[in-house]
């Protein structure tokens, strides 16, 4: 099974994390199953950007984002070329290195 490496994040996993993912599951589902509480305000329906992550390694192994995900990502805080919504990004057969951005759009709008 592929592994996901979550880079250290002060709030979500200060030490970082490494866990196995099931091919075909989303990055978000794998993270939640392993105790990493990535925010997902829209309950995984691709209607917000709170689960935005940056795939630092392994992006090429995944299916590309669709038009709806791209439209939502345009609203994300800290958008980068390798950004994905973790609720839509399906794990393939290669390991991934994932960074959770410092803020979500909710935190920015609330002044954190």
From Swiss-Prot:
Cofactor note: Binds 1 [2Fe-2S] cluster.
Protein task: Ferredoxin are iron-sulfur proteins that transfer electrons in a wide variety of metabolic reactions.
Residues annotated as binding [2Fe-2S] cluster: 42, 48, 51, 87
Family: Belongs to the adrenodoxin/putidaredoxin family.
Disulfide bonds: none
Keywords for the protein's UniProt record, in alphabetical order: 2Fe-2S, Electron transport, Iron, Iron-sulfur, Metal-binding, Transport
InterPro entries: 2Fe-2S_ferredoxin-like_sf, 2Fe-2S_ferredoxin-type, Adrenodoxin-like, Adrenodoxin_Fe-S_BS, Beta-grasp_dom_sf, Fdx_isc
GO biological process: electron transport chain; P450-containing electron transport chain
One Pfam family from the record: Fer2
Domain 2Fe-2S ferredoxin-type: 1-104
Entry cofactors: [2Fe-2S] cluster
GO molecular function, one term: 2 iron, 2 sulfur cluster binding
Name of protein: 2Fe-2S ferredoxin
Gene Ontology cellular-component annotations: cytosol
Gene name as annotated: fdx
SUPFAM superfamilies: 2Fe-2S ferredoxin-like (SSF54292)
